[in-house]
């Protein structure tokens, strides 16, 4: 009975967080999170390459329409994300990790915004 209750509680927690239901609520380390989770991951680490769609060196954010177009290599980082119980982790590919409680997320965008180059038509 307790196991069933805990299972239901875990499913409800994922729905509240906006995360899809997966085995145990876990997400193995990936650089390509499920499409339905992009809104969550890209809010708290918007410089991850998987958050952007790029063509001809110009990139548009897949989730946040208010983000400006950017030059491809100025801001984007190769990220891997994972979730284990209530710990969400961003691995930036350079040995830096950002770990947070999934239910109490903290943005980690500021260090990367300093390198962002916004696309201007004159850049062509």
Curated annotation (Swiss-Prot):
Induction: Expressed in the early phase of the viral replicative cycle. It comes from the Viruses. A motif (Prevents secretion from ER) lies at residues 121-124. Its main location: virion. It comes from African swine fever virus (isolate Tick/Malawi/Lil 20-1/1983) (ASFV). It is found in: Virion; Host endoplasmic reticulum-Golgi intermediate compartment. Keywords: Early protein, Glycoprotein, Signal, Virion. Causes the redistribution of lumenal ER protein to an enlarged ERGIC compartment. Glycans are attached at residue 64. Residues 1-28 form the signal peptide. This is Protein MGF 110-4L. InterPro entries: ASFV_fam_110. The keyword Glycoprotein applies. Belongs to the asfivirus MGF 110 family. GO terms for cellular component: host cell endoplasmic reticulum-Golgi intermediate compartment; virion component.
């Amino acid at each position: 009975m307790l196991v069933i209750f805990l299972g239901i509680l875990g499913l409800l927690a994922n729905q509240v967080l906006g995360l899809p239901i997966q085995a145990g609520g876990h997400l193995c380390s990936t650089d390509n999170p499920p499409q339905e989770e992009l809104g969550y991951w890209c809010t708290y680490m918007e410089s991850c390459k998987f958050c952007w769609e790029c063509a001809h060196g110009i990139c548009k954010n897949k989730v946040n329409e208010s983000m400006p177009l950017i030059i491809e290599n100025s801001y984007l980082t190769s990220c891997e994300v994972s979730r284990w119980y209530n710990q969400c982790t961003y691995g930036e590919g350079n040995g830096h990790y950002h770990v947070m409680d999934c239910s109490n997320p903290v943005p980690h965008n500021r260090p990367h915004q300093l390198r962002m180059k916004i696309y201007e038509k004159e850049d062509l």
